């Protein structure tokens, strides 16, 4: 059952033109936009899907935000992995409840959030980030989404190659690094035989170097692909593709660890 909105949680406000706004609700707070002002108290205590009028007479509809809404509107230290790529990563890296996942490149934590939600409380995510400023923003974004750093997540400052010294073992590894071929030896040692490695890379040069290195580092069944998202405009009179589409954001390279 969907509970009424409470102070301290986020609401997604949808205006009549389809624009969305992510708002942290506070008693006595006020939302300001081109659509006018709306007191947070008008939202608090009401269920999702409630339609409200601003001081200018514009209608806003309040929903709880989806993960994709958080990702698109979160503050960024590093470039985020977009929703159109998050889904394929979770699918092709075979992230499942209870999985032990190694992540390198926490960045703004969009992918980290998706991993933590998918593995659940019975799973484990260990995420490395070499840049202090990115880790600081990641912690804020994780706290904003979960309310705290989730119990199944360990955040570590430093290079993912340091995992070799821990003796830990993982079933899956997800990389968002500019040079993912560098720590392959350490990652091979940390992955279980048959484990999945999935790397997110923006350029073909990076992909080529990684794919050429993977067989020499104990990986096989290598696949590379990208996902494109094209929206459609549907009305009574016509059905046509949108004038704009979300094209290239990054490539995914997936491989399996040999014994």
Regions inferred by a protein language model and the residue ranges of each:
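N-terminal auxiliary segments of SAM/dcSAM-dependent transferases
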Residues: 1-64
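Conserved SAM-binding loop and adjacent beta-strand
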Residues: 2-3, 73-86
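Glycine-rich helix-loop-beta junction characteristic of Rossmann-like nucleotide cofactor-binding loops
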Residues: 91-96, 118, 146-147, 164, ...
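Glycine-centered, small-residue-biased loops immediately flanking beta-strands
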Residues: 99, 123, 195
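Conserved SAM-binding loop of SAM-dependent methyltransferases across substrates and taxa
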Residues: 108-121, 188-189
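S-adenosyl-L-methionine
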Residues: 128-180
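C-terminal substrate-binding/active-site "lid" region of AdoMet-derived donor-dependent transferases
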Residues: 184-251
